[in-house]
Amino acid sequence: MSRIGKKPVQVPAGVTANVDGQKVTAKGPKGELFFVANDEVSVKLENNTVVVQPVNESKDARAKWGMSRTMIENILKGVKDGYERKLEINGVGYRASMQGKNLQLALGFSHDVVYQTPEGITIAVPKPTEIVVSGINKQQVGQVAAEIREYRGPEPYKGKGVKYAEERIVRKEGKKK
């Protein structure tokens, strides 16, 4: 029994949800998203709530039950409020700036790193040491933030690099004399 899967997903106000077989479509003020559920689960729209049930009691069906429910909840929240991920840059000379739609990062390399913003994602740089990635697709926002962080992840000795705003870097002690 999936604890997450058995909870019905409430459709928020201002969002219209449509279930067509295995395809769940959500349309809201921020845009439109869809999710195609696996054949192991059944999806129904009842009284402004989306109910996900496993087709049978196989282990595979139970595993996809909770995941499908969470994905549907994510698209409903995304089209209403959207998602954002904040990144911080630490280090002398490390900074970020926007050049048109591209993000330019100075991260201590011999060249600046230019990251092209994908479709459906908005990147903002309120301060040279702060990056805000936002969009309606939770997976895509997280992936873009992870790709930016990957250019120069935080190192444990001085804490230099790109890190998530809520991330805590465990610092190591330097070598002793």
From Swiss-Prot:
Biological process (GO), any one: cytoplasmic translation
Protein keywords: Ribonucleoprotein, Ribosomal protein, RNA-binding, rRNA-binding
Any one GO cellular component localisation term in the record: cytosolic large ribosomal subunit
Pfam families (alphabetical): Ribosomal_L6 (PF00347)
Disulfide bonds: none
GO MF entries: rRNA binding; structural constituent of ribosome
Record-linked InterPro entries: Ribosomal_uL6-like (IPR000702), Ribosomal_uL6-like_a/b-dom_sf (IPR036789), Ribosomal_uL6_a/b-dom (IPR020040), Ribosomal_uL6_bac-type (IPR019906), Ribosomal_uL6_CS (IPR002358)
Subunit structure: Part of the 50S ribosomal subunit.
Family annotation (NCBIfam families): L6_bact
Free-text function comment from the UniProt entry: This protein binds to the 23S rRNA, and is important in its secondary structure. It is located near the subunit interface in the base of the L7/L12 stalk, and near the tRNA binding site of the peptidyltransferase center.
Family statement: Belongs to the universal ribosomal protein uL6 family.
Name of the molecule in the record: Large ribosomal subunit protein uL6
Organism name: Sinorhizobium medicae (strain WSM419)
